[in-house]
């Protein structure tokens, strides 16, 4: 497959995804970028680490600003996202793998929980974000 085909496939996946699937994609993207940043830090490629930590920070920001505030649980999610974001910023400032891994642990937990919510929700129901 060439890059144009891959890009078209990814674009189509995003355009046809439900809000719940988009949230899952954001979690997966944050995990991917954290893993790439860890590789960058380990290989002393600070530019790679910075760029990918910034992408992960942007995803966490997007998850925070799109929280549905009509559900009381939004405040709990916001606190977790704030913690993750601060860890990513610290990791970017210090280029510290342990800080990225700490953030990654929480992102994975959030993603895994979200996958369970998606499975438990009846088909066609509106899932909270």
Residue spans for each PLM region:
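N-terminal intrinsically disordered, cationic/polar leader segments
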Residues: 1-35, 39-43, 47-54, 58-61, ...
């Amino acid at each position: 497959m060439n890059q144009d085909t891959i890009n078209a496939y990814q674009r189509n996946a995003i355009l046809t995804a439900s809000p719940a699937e988009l949230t899952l994609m954001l979690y997966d993207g944050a995990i991917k970028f954290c893993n790439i940043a860890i590789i960058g830090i380990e290989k002393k490629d600070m530019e790679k680490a910075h760029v990918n930590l910034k992408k992960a920070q942007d995803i966490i920001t997007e998850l925070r600003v799109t929280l549905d505030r009509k559900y009381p649980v939004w405040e709990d999610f916001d606190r977790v996202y704030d913690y993750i974001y601060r860890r990513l910023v610290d990791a970017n400032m210090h280029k510290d793998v342990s800080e990225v891994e700490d953030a990654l642990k929480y992102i994975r937990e959030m993603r895994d929980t979200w996958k369970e919510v998606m499975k438990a929700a009846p088909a066609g129901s509106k899932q909270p974000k």
